[in-house]
Amino acid sequence: MENKQILWIVTELFPPDETSTAYILGEVANAMVQKYVVKVICGPEIYDKRKKLDEKNKFKLDASIEVLRVEGIDFDKNTTKGKALSFLLMSKRLYSLAKSNIKKEDKVLMVTNPAPLVLLMARLKRKIGFEWNVLVHDVFPENTKPAGLNLPLYGLFKHLFDKAYSKADQLIAIGRDMADVLGNKIKDCSKNKPKISIIENWADIEGITPQSMPEGNIVLEYAGNIGRVQGLNKVIEQLPENIEFHIYGTGAMEESLKKMNHPRVFFHGPYFRSQQNEVLSDCHIAIVTLQDGMYGLGVPSKTYNILAAGRPIVYFGPKNSEIDLLVREKQIGYCGWPLKWDKEELVEMGKRARALAESDYSEEAIMSKFIQAI
């Protein structure tokens, strides 16, 4: 029997943590066992200590996968200083484990969080010579500008990260706009440029199924991280009459949004992944946002489970970004506020959304892309 090659997955976030990145990397790890001996270098079991593990979480990690964990960082990640220090220390800890374990003949798949780890892994790849695949969820330092962060020495950081990205064997973008940005990012850095592939996130079409839309007023819903780049304050300021806005999740901007005291905005707090079907079905239309300037710098993974729930999308964000193209090309919602709200039209858009999730964005279809790419 032929010995399988080792694939190392390097990520701060990994199950049983329930962030979207953890969920994605856990499923990718399970899929890859059919081709590799999979080993994981990751952070602690829970990213946010305020959250509890979900006893109803059905995710099971393949028993053959070896997981090496580093200790967590006890800083407030909702502050800029706390997040920066957490990124630095977590990167150092993950790098130390990688340096001690990864061999030249191995393959590596890492995700771009925490950002400093990209620089360290580029250095390690240059030293050891393993095959380095980078799954790009966020593009640093470009993503600091839309977040309103004034990064000192921005030009120097961009040069260093552009060069680091160019050392990869493959960059995996999660959208067409991101592939465009990555191509520009590495174009002047290296003669042997990395391959750029596009592998979108997937929809949980088995765990999430369409339910009847609620009675009464049209309910607009946001479910996910309430961060600086989501621009939810603008949504609240522009909320049309007779539309309710329900927000699920937590994040750095949660308290400031609550202080707006809008009478038709309701906060429901965090939810478990096992509750997604109930949460995503409790609306007529779901909102996906990206801050101005975020073209190609991130693709909200929540989009695909919204499709699975059979709900249309109202999208606010850069034109020609992946979600903008998806909504307009497939007629599954609106880019900007609609001129009128029609429940029958929302139902038809929702049906198209579910059909699209089943045909193009099933887990099986997306995992086959990962297996072929790496």
Q: What residue ranges belong to the model's regions?
A:
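Nucleotide-sugar-dependent
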Residues: 230, 272-281, 286-307, 312-325
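A short, active-site helix/loop in glycosyltransferases that binds the activated sugar's phosphate group
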Residues: 158, 162-194, 324
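A charged, aromatic-enriched C-terminal amphipathic alpha-helix characteristic of glycosyltransferases
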Residues: 338-374
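Conserved donor-binding/catalytic core segment of Leloir-type glycosyltransferases
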Residues: 213-230, 236-240, 246
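Carbohydrate-associated surface elements
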Residues: 44, 177, 199-202
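Membrane-proximal helix-turn-helix segments that form the acceptor-binding/catalytic region
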Residues: 116-119, 123-127, 152-173
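N-terminal subdomain of nucleotide-sugar transferases
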Residues: 1-59, 237-240
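Nucleotide-activated donor-binding/catalytic signature segment of Leloir-type glycosyltransferases, i.e.
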Residues: 246-248, 254-277
